[in-house]
Amino acid sequence: MEGEEKLSDNAETEMTVDEIVHIVRIAVGLGISRVKLTGGEPLMRKDVVEIIKDIAAIPGLADLSMTTNGVLLTSLAEELYANGLKRLNISLPTLDEKVYNKLTGGRLGDVLEGVKAAVEAGFYPVKLNMLILKGVNDYTVDEMIEFARETGTILQLIELEPINISDAYYHASHKPLDEYEDMLKQKAVKVETRQFMQNRRIYHLPDVKVEVVHPIENTEFCMYCTRLRVTSDGKLKPCLMKNGNLVDILTPMRNGANDEKLTELFKLANHKRKPYNKS
């Protein structure tokens, strides 16, 4: 199960710590054992350590991870790890300071320090999410592979998806990952398939791993998807690519719905899961 989307500008619709933990507890009771906090930027919440601590304490939870831009990790990595967060995905599209600033408005140095802090705190694995953008960073994959090798991290090459962006931007920036997969196949000493992670391929190169996330026109991405998302305003989202089939769980919770009713809402969301990519 994953959290999703930017933090709400309206404090009334943003979930409290207790509400987040309650939803996760219901999910774990249904057999969901892995939770990832995403965003937006989850580290922007001042109560993020409390959220981590309370979720990690839920009996039956096997794995708790987070996707972050890494900017605030330097000061938070040790505390997050100590309170139960064990794995991290850090968004890092480039190692070029100017390109990074143009893409994000932030400082590359802050993220690089965050990567170092995460590794030193004990997080494993630490994955670097490199979203491939045509003409922006598509020519720097070899450099990123070397950085992952040097830092003991795993590089994830991620294909751009047409989500929350204009059609014009998508068509101008999207680049298929086929050529990178061909290159990785030639260099790999081993190729691993993560069946329950959309059949993703992990290429084991000497002293480094590279994972390829290829969702576009990929029927396996849907066939092997086991994820259910929760938006920051408390809606269950059955499909990453769709917004028309959300199930509101926060409103019933605030109106006093018992756990049996909330469990039924999870089952409804699961029933609404339909493949986006079809053969």
Feature names for model-found ranges:
Residues 41:
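Conserved G/P- and acidic residue-centered "switch" motifs that form tight phosphate/ATP-binding loops
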Residues 162-278:
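Accessory C-terminal segments flanking Radical SAM cores
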Residues 14-37, 45-156:
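Radical SAM/AdoMet-radical enzyme domain recognition
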Residues 1, 77-78, 100-101, 241, ...:
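A short local structural element in Rossmann-fold oxidoreductases
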Residues 1-15, 239-240:
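Canonical Radical SAM [4Fe-4S] cluster-binding loop centered on the CxxxCxxC motif
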Residues 4-10, 96-102, 164-168, 247-248:
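A short acidic, helix-capping loop that chelates divalent metal ions and anchors anionic groups
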